[in-house]
């Protein structure tokens, strides 16, 4: 169910997280179609996800990749890890991520791992709570990464220097 595939396209890493067969029941029977969940990132703090649906698997994956490229957000990273611990939630899924020392690697499962890898996070400790639905985990992970603030952002917001807030 949760297949992963990585493709390089114009400096973007693309990962296929899940393909699912769905059906619509009509008067004459069932109409089968497929959904695909993908994430795209540049490995340097830009990441996006897409969800596509079509009658054939390749078409669903293509739609999902296009949506992911259009839906990219920028994340402030700190030398391949996070600036501080963050929490994110979407629907019934909750995620917790914290920075890790160099050499730790990406300690995350399934859909969360795919998002972190394409975003360019190399060292992180993470845990998913509640629902492990891949779509909700991806949304919760991107929500958590988007809520992360770099010291420069905090300093600018407070009108201070980075040195002043780090004391």
UniProtKB/Swiss-Prot annotation:
GO terms for biological process: translation. It comes from the Bacteria. One of its GO terms (molecular function) is rRNA binding. One of its GO terms (cellular component) is small ribosomal subunit. Keywords: Ribonucleoprotein, Ribosomal protein, RNA-binding, rRNA-binding. Residues 12-75 form the S5 DRBM domain. InterPro entries: Ribosomal_Su5_D2-typ_SF (IPR020568), Ribosomal_uS5 (IPR000851), Ribosomal_uS5_bac-type (IPR005712), Ribosomal_uS5_C (IPR005324), Ribosomal_uS5_N (IPR013810), Ribosomal_uS5_N_CS (IPR018192), Ribsml_uS5_D2-typ_fold_subgr (IPR014721). The keyword RNA-binding applies. Pfam families: Ribosomal_S5, Ribosomal_S5_C. With S4 and S12 plays an important role in translational accuracy. The N-terminal domain interacts with the head of the 30S subunit; the C-terminal domain interacts with the body and contacts protein S4. The interaction surface between S4 and S5 is involved in control of translational fidelity. Belongs to the universal ribosomal protein uS5 family. HAMAP family: Ribosomal_uS5_B (MF_01307_B). Part of the 30S ribosomal subunit. Contacts proteins S4 and S8. This is Small ribosomal subunit protein uS5. The gene is rpsE.
